[in-house]
Each structure stands twice: as structure tokens, then as C-alpha cells.
Design a protein with these regions (language model features):
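Short, charged, low-hydrophobicity "junction" segments
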Residues: 47, 61-66
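Short, well-structured N-terminal submotif of metal-dependent ribonuclease cores
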Residues: 1-35, 43-58, 123
Length: 128
């Protein structure tokens, strides 16, 4: 299963040159509910047309979103192998929560810091 980071979702939704190949999206996807907030806040901040916001909502329907619960948020407050920012910490804590639940994920991200820290934590990186 692929853990989808916001950087890859935005690249796809904004049709950037570095977006993943079409076949990438055939895989099962999971992410933190944080993804929903990051995407919709970004779209709203840009004053994006309602149709584009609707496209983002449809995009999110294809992804299993893990709620931001207290254990994951508490883990995000703890130290990671490398220095991370708040949103990265929440994504990493969610990935760790999934691993504890027995679900191994590959991380799809364009965020260098997130990729390096996820790798240091033993997560595989998806080819995006």
C-alpha cells in the first residue's frame, strides 16, 4: 500500500511535470486525514475555482484517510531520527501507527526531509 504525501497529491492535481505516471494511481493509497486539510486549504488559499476544489474532493475519495487520533498526535511530539517540521511529524507518526497495526506502506513523497526521515525509520520509498 502507498502512503501518499501531500507533495505528490498536489503535483498530480496541479498537473506538474514531476507527477507520477498514470499507473501509479492504480495502487491502494492511504494517508493521514491531514492530507485533506493540506489540499483543501491550499486550493482555497489560491482562490481556486469551485470546480477544482470539487476535483480535489473526488481525488480524496480514492484514498483511505487515517483520522488524527491522540496516539498519533502524541507520537508526532516525540523525537524523530532527523529534524522534521510539524506536518512531516504528523505524517510520519501516522505511518508509524499504520506499521504498528500491521500495515506496511511505501512512502510517496517529493519532500526530501520527509523521504530521508521515513527512510531512516525503515520505510521504503515509492517510485514517483
Amino acid at each position: 500500500m502507498i502512503y501518499l504525501d501531500t507533495s505528490v497529491a498536489l503535483a498530480s492535481l496541479f498537473d506538474e511535470p514531476r507527477k507520477p505516471a498514470t499507473e501509479f494511481w492504480a495502487q491502494a493509497m492511504v494517508s493521514s486525514r491531514l492530507l485533506e486539510y493540506e489540499l483543501l486549504v491550499r486550493f482555497n488559499a489560491l482562490g481556486t475555482a469551485p470546480e477544482a476544489v470539487g476535483k480535489a474532493r473526488v481525488f480524496l475519495e480514492g484514498i483511505v484517510l487515517v483520522d488524527l487520533d491522540q496516539p498519533a498526535l502524541a507520537r508526532a511530539l516525540q523525537q524523530f531520527p532527523l529534524v522534521v517540521r510539524t506536518l512531516e511529524a504528523i505524517h510520519l507518526a501516522t505511518m508509524e501507527f499504520l506499521r504498528v497495526q500491521g500495515l506496511e506502506v511505501e512512502v510517496a513523497t517529493y519532500d526530501r526531509r520527509l523521504a530521508e526521515t521515513a527512510g531512516a525509520m525503515g520505510f521504503k520509498l515509492a517510485d514517483v
